[in-house]
Amino acid sequence: MQKSYDYDAIVIGSGPGGEGAAMGLVKQGARIAVIERYHNIGGGCTHWGTIPSKALRHAVSRIIEFNQNPLYSDHTRLLRSSFADILNHTENVVSQQTHMRQGFYERNHCEIFQGDARFIDANTLEIETHDGSIERLTAEKFVIACGSRPYHPPDVDFTHPRIYDSDSILNLHHEPGHVIIYGAGVIGCEYASIFRGLAVKVDLINTRDRLLAFLDQEMSDSLSYHFWNNGVVIRHNEEFEKVEGVADGVIMHLKSGKKLKADCLLYANGRTGNTDSLSLENVGLEADGRGLLKVNSMYQTAQPNIYAVGDVIGYPSLASAAYDQGRIAAQAMIKGEATAHLIEDIPTGIYTIPEISSVGKTEQQLTAMKVPYEVGRAQFKHLARAQIVGMNVGSLKILFHRETKEILGIHCFGERAAEIIHIGQAIMEQKNGGNTIEYFVNTTFNYPTMAEAYRVAALNGLNRLF
């Protein structure tokens, strides 16, 4: 006899992964509930991560643009804005996003429960709501999409008013003149750009020997040069020995013997999956040391009726990928298999000032693989559109196979890079000979546009062939 459950599926978390799963399930006729720990839906992406940090970055980059444009600024009266003022702008964007996403759930009749979820057994969840009451829900299947949080090493006192992580930095209400950013990954580099754009002194501590080592080396070098040129001090191959919170700031002692003092510290070195409160032991699951769960190609955990998507399964830890993972998991849960799958070449967008974006292979990877590739380049400063809008910093690089002309990788550094990359990505994904660099020479682009960089880069690369 088939058991009856309250729901066909319960989704834990309402970030991009949870939303993708919830919408995918409900569109296939499933009865679902969504459990969200916080007062507003949207998860870390909407409230502490992607959305507020990109809104911050946009505001800062517009200030920089104004101050550098001789039409508006004569350099005697620079436009200035405080971090706190700009945060008000981000709150407006966050509330629009929250309102819109709330509407998705309401229109699709998804029940939302607020509170902390924990497993009782493989089909039962207990929810502790904000007023302390306990509710039990049962479902045939579950999706764990509870995201991640900034990693807190035990020897750093995050209760100190001048020590922040990448979530709490959005509550910064004093005006720092000098900030130490520990961790030069994507988040560290993005905030280094934001603070430097607000004329704050920045010490960026990198635990590795170069910035964002997963990028094509030229892109990484471009960012390093741009930081250096703007006065960001980068300290490579450093680790902290001790972090000392003092009355007027923070002192960081490095293992190399150096000492740094600043008005505040942003610790941005790693993230931890939010699995510790789920009582996973009750369903025979175990997270690794960073709170992450292992899944198969259909996002199924070792417990067959429990799936996991988003940051909680680790790489690639992107909001864009999490949404797709949720959608794919929903299909697998209803149909037993998923015809869709995550694309092999997921584009990377890094919202530094200027942006970096890439898709496909790097020069270093292709060289190691002994692939006979050629390079086509376009400098933004040679494009009419870039000259008109004053976006002269940057370049587009296309890597393609010398013989087949197949595009193997695209790398872009400069304003709007994360948008520009998708034109090349669309051609790269074409099958049956559609992926060729010659497309960019044989098509007609609007003029003047930034997209025209593809035509310039394609001609540059094809002219190298002999």
From Swiss-Prot:
Principal location: cytoplasm
Subcellular location: Cytoplasm
Sorted UniProt keywords: Cytoplasm, FAD, Flavoprotein, NAD, NADP, Oxidoreductase
Gene name linked to the record: sthA
PANTHER family per the UniProt record, alphabetical: DISULFIDE OXIDOREDUCTASE (PTHR22912), SOLUBLE PYRIDINE NUCLEOTIDE TRANSHYDROGENASE (PTHR22912:SF93)
Listed NCBIfam families: PRK05249.1
Descriptive protein name: Soluble pyridine nucleotide transhydrogenase
Binding site for FAD: 36-45
A Pfam family per the record: Pyr_redox_dim
Gene Ontology molecular function: dihydrolipoyl dehydrogenase (NADH) activity; flavin adenine dinucleotide binding; NAD(P)+ transhydrogenase (Si-specific) activity
Organism name: Erwinia tasmaniensis (strain DSM 17950 / CFBP 7177 / CIP 109463 / NCPPB 4357 / Et1/99)
Family membership noted in the UniProt record: Belongs to the class-I pyridine nucleotide-disulfide oxidoreductase family.
Protein function: Conversion of NADPH, generated by peripheral catabolic pathways, to NADH, which can enter the respiratory chain for energy generation.
Cofactor detail note: Binds 1 FAD per subunit.
